[in-house]
Amino acid sequence: MSKLDEMTAYLPPFLTKLKEMAELLKAEAPEFEKQNNSIFDLTDQLFVTTATWGLERWEKILNVPRESGDTDEIRRLRLISKMSNIPPATYRAIEHALNRFLKNPSAQVRLLPGEYRFKVDIDIDDMQHMSELIETLENMKPAHLAYTLRAALNEPLQIKDTVILNNRRYRKASELKVGYSVTLNNNEVVLV
């Protein structure tokens, strides 16, 4: 329904038949349409997920630097990451925050108890926003923990190799005689 039809529906029928009222509605309907669009656009700027030209204000409020070449989507993700950083951070919260930057959510956080660190495995195909991933990790991780960020393959690898294991025992200097070999025994095992 157009704005003209909407405004006409609010009026009593006898007013809609007047030529002056029809002309007035034709002139004012586009202006009301522009005003409504401006109101909706302004309302969109109040939320990070829908903001466009208001992202700059959000970045200023949250003290998030803008980098050249950033798309609106990356800027939004960076802002959401900053806003959702509520301590204490669990490994699942860190995984969830990192997966926002990945095409295929593949981040896996594994705690290493007793070592005061954790490791983060991310599929090597999803490593396109590396600086954002590191920044998110630095912002979310507890201060006393270190981390290792590793690019991982999401495919099983099968390694085939042959290993030859030699267990040689040599003679002592006092046991050496002419004609004897230097080795006392030579056990060789082939592992496939």
Swiss-Prot record:
Alphabetical list of Pfam families matching this protein: Phage_Mu_Gp48 (PF10076)
Q: Classify the source by domain of life.
A: Bacteria
Q: Which InterPro entries match?
A: Phage_Mu_Gp48
Q: Which family does it belong to?
A: To B.subtilis XkdU.
State the protein's name: Uncharacterized protein YqcA
Which species? Bacillus subtilis (strain 168)
